[in-house]
Every structure is written in C-alpha cells, then in structure tokens.
Amino acid sequence: MAAAGGYVQNAIETTPNGQNNPSAVSATTFYHPLTQADWQVPVLWDDRTDELRGFSDNVQPDLVGYDPQVWGANLRLYPNLFGLYMHAIHGLGTFTAGNGVITDPAGVTMPASTNRWVWTAGTTNTQVRSLQRHIVYPDQSVFILQRGCVPEQIQVQADGEVMKMNVTGHNLYTAQEADPALSPTYDALTVKPFLRSHMGQPATWLAQTATHASFGFTLDNPVSFDRTLSGSAFPDIVDRTGVDLRLTVQLSTRNLDTDDIAALLAGTNFTVKTSWVSTQFITGSYPYKLFIEGNAVYSDLSPDGLQHQIRHGGTIPVTFGRSSGGTPSYTITLCNGVSSYSSVS
C-alpha cells in the first residue's frame, strides 16, 4: 500500500537476523513518523589487476561480499516510540503496568492505563537485540528489507524547543523485496514529542551547581560484527565487545560556577536525577515522563571565552559509572502508553 513520502516498519528480532539465520520476528510492529530513514550497502570487491595475465589494463573487479550495512533513523522524541529503540538497544528491561499502587521515580502513583519501563545499566550483557525494517519508497516502487539492525547509538538533544532523537547502527543483511503491501498506522497526532520546556532544573545534581540551560544524552552500545562459515556473503553474527552500554550527557550551563569547576578538578562523583514531564496526559492527570538517574562525574569543561559581556556559560560533558557501593551507573525510566514492544522474547 502506497503512502505519501514512504514509510518504515520496525519490528523486534529475537536475535540479529542475517541472510541465512533468521530468528523469530515480533508480530508487534511500529511505524515511526521519521524525518529521515537512512540505509547503505558497502560492497566488497576483489581487484585481480595484480595478476600476471600478459596485459597492463585494469581488470573489472569482482563482487565478493558485503560489509555490515549502515542504517539510521531521525525523529522527534516521542514518548511511546523512544521505548522501541530502548528495547532494541537495551533489551526488554523491567515492565510494570500502572495499577494505582506503583510509583514513578518522582514518587507519583501511576494509575491504570499507564506503563512503566525501566532499563538499568549492567543488565544487557546477554544476547544482542535488533530490529527488522521494511523501507518503502512507494513513488519509485523500491522496497528494501533490512535484517539484524542493531542500534549502536541513541542520541537525544534539543533542536530549538523540540527534543530530537537520532538512532544509528549497522545491520547484517539488506535486500530488495516485493511490495510488502503494508498498511502503516501511527500514533495519533495528539501524542506529541517531549520539548525542552518539559525539563526543569534537575531534582538531584551536584550541590550549588550552575543553572542548567540545555541537556542532551547519548547511549552507546559497543558491538562487533563478524562472519562464520554460514554460506552467505553477508556478515552473520553480532557480539558484545565485553563492555556494557555507556551513558554520557552533554550539559550546557547558563553561567560558570565555582562548584562545578571544583567538582571537575577534584573528580567529584555525585548522584543525578532529572526528567522530562510532558504537558500531555496518558490518562486522567498522569503525563508522559522520562527519567534519567545515575552516578555521574564531570569529564571536561568547555567554558565560554572571556569577552566584554556580563554572563559566561559553558558546556560540560558528564560521564556515568558504577558507584563504589555497587549502584548501577544509570537507570532510565519511561512512563508511557505502550504495554508491549515485542511478541517475541
């Protein structure tokens, strides 16, 4: 079925699927209102010009295989859709349906018809998660199937007043397919993305810190793509590198502050709790929310250069790590209206 501008269907895979090793794919599918969907197929060639064949001309190269393919997705930070990419990069996490008893990290009771998703650092060193994508260009009758799409980075930052999300990674297998004849369905337009204004000053941060002006974060997923004797010209396996996912924050402050500078110079560790709280409600008076908590340390400081002006701010990268007491480096909690991201485990 054609759709203006095309569409992309996303579904969770049990394990990253290659050409010849398909695992189960979720029947629960998602169509994201992307602003851009990227894909690319790097081709491997064998150039036999170096052989002694009695002539000096170049030989046409032979196609011998494919490197891991590039994929990406750009979209606004929608509260329901962020969870799918978290599932794909971090696994299922811990799901609890709102019941009038459980609370969110702010201590607010979550009613029925709300859902709490929690992803905690140090719990992902099991199987690698991935997505299957159908990419449809209806006007050109081009239909692309991608398997084994592993998110290697999720980056969230403000674009003006709107929070944007950029997801990038590689995948194992890309091919053309017949028209999948899908019928895209999207969240209602009434479900809006998180805004910069949905974030206030953090509930917990370094004492006496400067006033925060903007906040973005990056979640990196270190994986490696490899080949076995699978009978395929494509790579067919994805491994964790032995390092867990890493969360970093890019913080902009309105002014320079001696406490922030002292914390950087001393390598001071501190606890963080910050959140986006939407002005839209999931049900009743309970809004969409996104929380980041963890153990942080300033890793650098880029202050504004001294100029003939009253106020000077700065940019501070923040790194998260496991505390000496064993507390996980970070916890990400999403409160939204989705009760399932996958029909496969």
Where on the chain are the PLM-derived regions?
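Signature of extracytoplasmic/envelope-associated structural regions
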Residues: 1-345
